[in-house]
Amino acid sequence: MIRHRLTALALAFGASFVPFAPACAEAPAIHTQVPGYYRAAVGDLEITALYDGYVDLAASVLLNANKAEVQRLLARKFIAGEKVQTAVNAYLINLGGKLILVDTGAAKAFGPTLGFIGEQIRAAGYTPEQIDIVLLTHLHADHVAGLLGADGKPQFPNAEVRVDQAESDFWLSEANAAKAPKDFQPFFKIARDSAAPYQAAGKWKPFSGAAELAPGIKAVPAVGHTPGHTAYQIESKGERLLILGDAVHSHAVQFARPEVAIEFDSDKKQAVATRKKLFAWAAKEKLLVSGMHLPFPGLGHVRADGKAFAWVPVEYSPLRNDK
């Protein structure tokens, strides 16, 4: 009897001390990516990669290789399907006294997956109004349309814009636009519209050849993709970054097969020759390189691989001061 009472008391005592278990609310999925910026150092300079967004390109735009070979190379990188997600990047260079932006993204020229350069600049701790110089690799819409904001006004009102003279002459010519295929004519208009307010303000300033555009920043003529396509070399304290522009569109295909052109190249033979030359230079000199269509942040190295090349992306890293 006593044992039964003790058991009952123990059960009652234990029941009164059931630990409180708070109700757990469901955690909804966020469905958005983290801000698209990434910092790296080149000597004393701080480089910020900016993610404008992405565009899905058909694998069929890659030329000089049969479809089976292209699909094989894509599959090696676990890229499946006919559409290939392709990043659109830009790069912000902090010189200490000046801020220089290389390319401006697509604005909304290619739909809602692009056009986030202004947003990423702010997320990175700057404002578009702080940009002193915009360097353009070329005047295709996904590089120049971001000169204008959503309101149609200059997104970088305090910046002067530098671009190769031949590139400027070609794309801003109404005569060239009239001779172009009809479905390509809108891209001439985008270039003209993007440049117009900067021209009116006296801030559109073309250069020629291998010009030095700021301390440690040189233009590297890289024609072929367009008539005045330009790469840029950034140098500080013996360290160098080569911004390739559109010398490469597909990391999965064009490093392994640098002879593969893309439908958008204005001079495909020259574009291939330029790509091979830039890749060989980057590999020999062990340059840090970046590209506007390499997977974000688009920073890495080029390694020689027989008669071809391999892309070696950088490891995510803090900005170290212990070197």
Where are these regions (language model features)?
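Metallo-beta-lactamase
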Residues: 115, 122-126, 130, 157-160, ...
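Bacterial N-terminal signal peptides
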Residues: 8-19
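Conserved beta-strand hairpin/beta-sheet module of binuclear metal-dependent hydrolase folds
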Residues: 32-124, 231-248
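Active-site metal-binding motif and surrounding structural segment of the metallo-beta-lactamase
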Residues: 87-90, 96-98, 111-162
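Sec/Tat signal peptide C-region and signal peptidase I cleavage site
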Residues: 20-25
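Cap/insert and terminal regions of metallo-dependent hydrolase folds
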Residues: 111, 231-233, 237-323
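Histidine-centered catalytic micro-motifs
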Residues: 134-144, 222-229, 290-297
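Active-site metal-binding loops of divalent metal-dependent hydrolases
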Residues: 52-53, 104-107, 139, 166-167, ...
